[in-house]
Design a protein with these regions (language model features):
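Active-site anion/phosphate-binding pocket segments in diverse small-molecule metabolic enzymes
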Residues: 1-178
Length: 178
């Protein structure tokens, strides 16, 4: 192609190619998933900064009793009295159902476990460690994706790739680009 189009720039390296070797770079590179902090390799550690922060609003906080169940199919049964929060996000927003009981969200750096099955629009979380929030009148948001819970660690939790976690996020989010 370069013989016919002498002024054309050559490109071979996508995100993975960028980290292989400069001989793959040619005239320019095409970073994709790496722009978002996604590791293009499955078995190779690359130190990338997470640039995605996904927040979800806590729409309900309630007390449940020992042996109460949470979620469709009653997939979570409380082993003790607990404070449970419901957040306004679910699989319709691209949060894979495989994250059911297999994920945490964060509030002020504190890890809160997902309880039970992720539903279409809602996820329940364990807020027992934050009892003062039960009576709070403040609007509360939790971090679903952040520096502790980036697309690379989330993808490992459900045996997929960071591309899938990122591209599954739907169009129901208010996006803010900084």
């Amino acid at each position: 192609i370069r013989k016919e189009f002498k002024e054309s720039k050559a490109s071979l390296a996508n995100s993975a190619g960028i980290f292989l070797n400069k001989k793959y770079h040619f005239d320019l590179v095409r970073p994709g998933i790496a722009l978002y902090g996604g590791n293009p390799f499955i078995n190779k550690k690359i130190d990338l900064k997470n640039v995605i922060n996904l927040k979800a609003k806590v729409i309900q906080i309630r007390q449940i009793q020992k042996n109460d169940t949470v979620g469709y199919g009653a997939t979570f049964k409380a082993k003790k009295d607990m404070l449970v929060g419901t957040i306004a996000i679910g699989y319709a927003d691209g949060i894979n159902r495989k994250f059911s009981s297999n994920m945490c969200v964060f509030l002020d750096g504190k890890q809160l476990k997902v309880l039970g099955r992720i539903s279409m629009d809602l996820i329940t979380i364990d807020m027992t460690s934050l009892p003062k929030l039960k009576k709070s009148k403040k609007i509360i948001y939790v971090d679903v994706i952040n520096k502790y819970n980036d697309i690379n660690s989330l993808s490992k939790n459900i045996d997929t790739i960071s591309y899938e976690v990122l591209t599954s996020l739907g169009n129901r989010y208010k996006r803010q680009y900084i």
